[in-house]
C-alpha cells in the first residue's frame, strides 16, 4: 500500500481514517490524494486507475483507491500457513469512476462496396460444386473406349483439384460402379452389372403377372363366399333350414320307436345331458371345430331297397331273438320339404350298414386265424384248382430257399431268363 509521505497537510487526516478503519484496503492497494491547493512539500504521486471514494469526502480533498469486489464473510478462520496469494476481480463497468465518454451512436462497419460484385474470371458456387464435377467426370468415362480413365488427365481436363476427383472415385468404387486398375487409373464397371438384366426383368414380370392372377382368383373366391354367407344369413327360406328342430325329427319317425343318432364331434367336446321323465336333452359344445350329427331312422318294409332285402331276410331271426323289447313295425315316415337336405345325406348304403339297436348290442364274434403255411403247399393247391386251364404244370420262377441267401446279379449281356434254371422255350403261349 502506497501512502503519501508524512509532512503533507493531508497526511494526518489520512492516517486518522486508516486508524479508525473507515477504509478497507489491501496491501497492494494504491491511494491517490488529489487536493485543490498544491502541496509543495509533498512529492507528486503517480495517478493510476481510480474508484469511488471509500471514506468521508472533503470538498478540498478527494481520495481514490483501486476498486475491490465485496468479499464474502469467512466461514471459518484459515490456518496461518504463510501469506496467501491475493485474488482480485475488477468489475470496471459498475465500480470504476472513470467512464469513457460517449463518442456518439455505435455504427457497424460498412459493407465493402466491391464485395458483392464478382470479378469476371471468378467461378460461381455451382460451377465448383461436387455435383457438377461428378457429372463431368461421368461424361469422361462415357467417352472412354474401354472405360479406363487416368485421374491425372481427368483433373487437368476438368480443371479441378485431384482430391475432388478422389472424392468422386471413392463413392463410385463403394457402390461397385468403378474399379481401380492401377494407382491413378480406374475402369467403369456399370456395363457389367447390366448383363442379364433383361432376363431378370422378364422373369420378374412373369412372376408379378402370376401373383396378380392369383390375387384376382382369391378375390373372386372371397366374393363368392361372402355372397353365400349373406344368402345363408339373410334369406328367410334358407334360415328355417339352418337348424333341425324337434318337430322335424317327429315328422321323420314315430316318437315311440327307437332312433339312432350318430354324433361326430372333435376332441374336448363338452356334453351335457338332461334326463327327465318326459324329455331327454343333450347339449354339445365344442371350440375345436364343427359337430356333425346324423340321424339313422328305421324304415318300413315297403321302403326297403333291393340292396337291403337280402340283409333283412338273413338277419330276421336274429332280430326276433333280441331282448323282446321291439315294438310294432314303424309307420312310414312322413316326408317334409324342410328335411330334404338331411335325408339326402342318408344314402341307402349307410342305412344298410347300420342294423337295429339289438344287433349292435350283440357280442362280436372273434375270427380265428389259421397259421401261415409254406408257399409250396399253397402252390400244390393252386395246381389242383387250375389243372384244367394250363397244359403243363406250374414252373416255380424263384429258386428254392437256401440256408445262405445271396444277391442276384446280371451281366450286361444277360436278361431276366438267366435268373431261373429253366427253359422257357418249351412253354406254350397263353390264349385268352
From Swiss-Prot:
Residue positions, PTM N6-acetyllysine: 115, 118, 123
Coiled-coil residue windows: none
DEF box (motif): residue ranges: 156-192
Taxonomic placement: Eukaryota, Metazoa, Chordata, Craniata, Vertebrata
Gene source species: Rattus norvegicus (Rat)
Region (Leucine-zipper), start-end ranges: 151-172
Record InterPro entries: E2F, E2F-DP_heterodim, E2F_CC-MB, E2F_WHTH_DNA-bd_dom, WH-like_DNA-bd_sf, WH_DNA-bd_sf
Region of interest: Transactivation: 363-432
Protein name: Transcription factor E2F1
